[in-house]
């Protein structure tokens, strides 16, 4: 860090009582808030998508979200918020949110709650379901990191990026370049939220 101060170091720390030590003593720039905001939002989503008998006190959104930001206090800017990564099941998979259209409520919380950065996992912005049955991983709601694999939604997204059509945020233009209608609508809504979070000073800087 002393030699290359521009390098950003992110750590996975799953014990919340160690958050402060890893930021203030060890010196990481950001920590995955997996055990905090991610787990809180996941319980809310799963309870609403599939009533699995979870006790009501564990999934009430206002209570859980409030409890997490109060715990973090001045550590909030050092968290890395996310809804998907290589370890967790895809939001739109049958094992989590079941439908990419359900992503927006937790997305808005992750983006707008504080000034912490937000990580986008590839394909999340088009609602990739992660339901392919890959060789090693199998159908587990994740995009494999162990197999030589091709993801159809990513192929379609790449075509849109290469053509420049993504700049329009127009579903009709995106479908012309090969996206499905659902992917195009998810992408536009997702991009609008990210653009707002990165441009509005009240959200970006908390002022």
State where each predicted segment sits.
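Active-site cleft segment of glycoside hydrolase catalytic domains centered on the general acid/base Glu
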Residues: 1
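A general structural signal for short secondary-structure junctions and capping/turn motifs
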Residues: 20-22, 69-74, 109-113, 136-137
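Extracellular glycoside hydrolase catalytic/binding regions
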Residues: 30-56, 96-98
